[in-house]
Every structure is written in structure tokens, then in C-alpha cells.
């Protein structure tokens, strides 16, 4: 059976298990202390301390993904990120996402499992709202439309911050990776740029998308850097971590990168500063 058809018939349950494993992992991430930031000893690597399956979360995604009552909601996705909203809701962000319906067993492939039709809609990104541990709704998908033919946006880290420094109003800012279709080895797309989307709160309406780090001028795609693998706020700065795609081009290792932005200015390209190993450029 072709791999694409096999993948399409899977229900949300499988994703939920993977999601639980990823969320159960205890990842230790830290910024260097003041001395290290100014060129002192490099911070040591961090490793996974432990992990365990989050059964309640797995079951909730299985319930929501396998619900056959709607034809326009999430039934499975990858590239999972989440962000807590000021009103207590949790917003789940996904990259490639299946919509449509999931059907109960038996399925036409002869297995006793739920199944998804081969013509199920696939979008490049989606967002699902959770309240008090229960998934409520899928926002209109794709939430972030393709920037150009042959290109798409994958959401990564997200952060609630003031609309501008010191402003009382808060907004949600979502880091986006822009990729473009390309030949092997770029099976996940050629890196193009990092963007920042601003969403209003509490209605989660996309107000704008701004390109903050365009990489199209870097000739070697494996050296193009995308930001947003994760982020952390400290001392009035938002630190944004990123990386390149050297391993996609069979290089030994990919490299990590770091940028920082004053709190409230993630959507301003001129406010971004990049660590070059000895200072912020």
C-alpha cells in the first residue's frame, strides 16, 4: 500500500500518542548567565531528563480527532506547539494538518481501526483551542495562508506580549517558518524566511504577518537560518532560538542560532538583534 494512502487513513489517535510523548519529555533549556553572554565560558548542553506519556491529553486528542460530527475540523497534524492565553485557554498550533471526517471501524483496508478518506483535505497549518483540558474548536484553516505559489507557512513558537513596549493591551505573536517546494534532499521544503504573525486577543484574529529574517539571499539553502524553534523571556528581552538545515544536506550537524528582541517588539524586524558569538549584531 502506498505510504501516502496509509498515512491518510490514520485517525487522530496516533498523533495523540506522539503528542503525549513529546509533551511528556522534560527538556531543560537555559540562557547563559551574564558572564557567559559577554564571551565567558559556553553554556553546557542540555539533555532530556525523563519523559512519560500524558494519558489524559492523548485521550482528549483522540476524542476530538475521531469525532465524526464535523467535516471542517482537525483530525490530525504534526509540528505541534502550544501557548497559554491570558484567559486561561490553551492554543495548539500545528503544521501539516488533516481536516475532514474520521470514520469508525471497520475500514475498507481490512483493519479494525478508525480511518480517514484518501481525499481528506490537507492544509499547511491549523490551530485548535482548548479550555480546561477539553478541545473546543478548530480555527478556520489554514490560519496562515500561503505567502506565494509553491510556498507555505509552518507555525512554531508563540508568545503573548504587549502590543508595543509598555502598552496595556496584549496580543499573540506567532513565529512562522516559510518554506518552498524543492528537489531532494529538501523533502521538508527549502528554507525561505522567518515571519511573525500578530493575532488579536481574545478573538485570535490574524491582524498582520511581517517578515523578520529573509534568507533568500543566502545561496546555500543548508546555511539558511529559521528562528522560532523555541523562545524564552528574560529581563525585558525575548530570546528566540533557531537553526539551519545542514543535516538535510548530509552535513555532520546543524548549527543553533540565537536572536533577541525587546519585549513587545517581536513583530518589528529592525528590533531584532543576533548573537554572533561575542556580541549582539
Q: PLM features: residue spans?
A:
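Beta-strand initiation motifs
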Residues: 45, 50, 129-138, 201-211, ...
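Conserved catalytic-core segments centered on acid/base and nucleophilic motifs
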Residues: 80-85, 159, 199, 229-232, ...
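Short N-terminal edge-element motif at the start of the domain
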Residues: 187-188, 198-227
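Residues that flank catalytic or metal-binding motifs in active/ligand-binding sites
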Residues: 78, 88, 154, 192-195, ...
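N-terminal regions that are enriched for targeting/export leaders
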Residues: 30-179, 190
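Secretory targeting and sorting signals
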Residues: 3, 7-32
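Active-site cradle of extracellular carbohydrate-active enzymes
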Residues: 228, 232-281
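Structural motif
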Residues: 98-115, 182-198, 248-259
Amino acid at each position: 500500500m502506498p505510504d501516502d494512502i496509509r498515512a491518510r487513513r490514520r485517525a487522530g489517535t496516533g498523533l495523540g500518542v506522539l503528542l503525549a510523548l513529546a509533551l511528556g519529555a522534560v527538556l531543560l533549556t537555559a540562557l547563559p548567565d551574564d558572564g557567559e553572554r559577554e564571551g565567558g565560558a559556553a553554556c553546557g548542553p542540555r539533555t532530556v531528563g525523563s519523559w512519560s506519556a500524558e494519558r489524559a491529553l492523548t485521550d482528549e486528542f483522540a476524542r476530538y480527532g475521531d469525532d465524526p460530527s464535523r467535516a471542517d475540523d482537525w483530525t490530525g497534524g504534526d509540528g505541534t506547539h502550544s501557548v497559554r492565553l491570558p484567559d486561561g485557554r490553551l492554543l495548539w498550533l500545528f503544521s501539516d494538518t488533516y481536516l475532514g471526517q474520521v470514520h469508525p471501524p471497520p475500514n475498507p483496508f481490512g483493519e479494525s481501526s478508525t480511518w480517514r478518506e484518501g481525499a481528506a483535505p490537507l492544509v499547511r497549518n491549523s490551530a485548535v483551542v482548548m479550555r480546561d483540558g477539553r478541545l473546543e474548536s478548530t480555527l478556520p484553516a489554514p490560519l496562515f495562508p500561503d505567502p506565494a505559489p509553491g510556498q507555505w507557512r509552518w507555525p512554531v513558537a508563540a508568545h503573548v506580549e504587549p502590543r508595543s513596549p509598555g502598552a496595556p493591551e496584549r496580543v499573540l505573536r506567532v513565529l512562522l517558518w516559510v518554506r518552498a517546494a524543492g528537489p531532494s534532499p529538501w523533502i521538508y521544503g527549502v528554507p525561505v524566511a522567518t515571519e511573525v504573525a500578530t493575532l488579536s486577543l481574545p478573538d485570535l484574529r490574524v491582524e498582520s504577518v511581517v517578515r523578520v529574517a529573509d534568507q533568500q539571499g543566502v545561496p546555500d539553502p543548508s546555511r539558511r537560518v529559521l528562528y522560532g524553534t523555541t523562545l524564552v523571556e528574560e529581563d525585558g528581552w525575548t530570546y528566540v532560538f533557531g537553526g539551519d538545515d545542514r543535516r538535510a544536506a548530509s552535513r555532520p550537524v546543524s548549527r543553533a542560532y540565537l536572536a533577541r528582541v525587546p519585549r513587545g517588539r517581536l513583530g518589528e524586524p529592525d528590533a531584532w538583534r543576533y548573537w554572533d558569538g561575542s556580541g549582539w549584531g
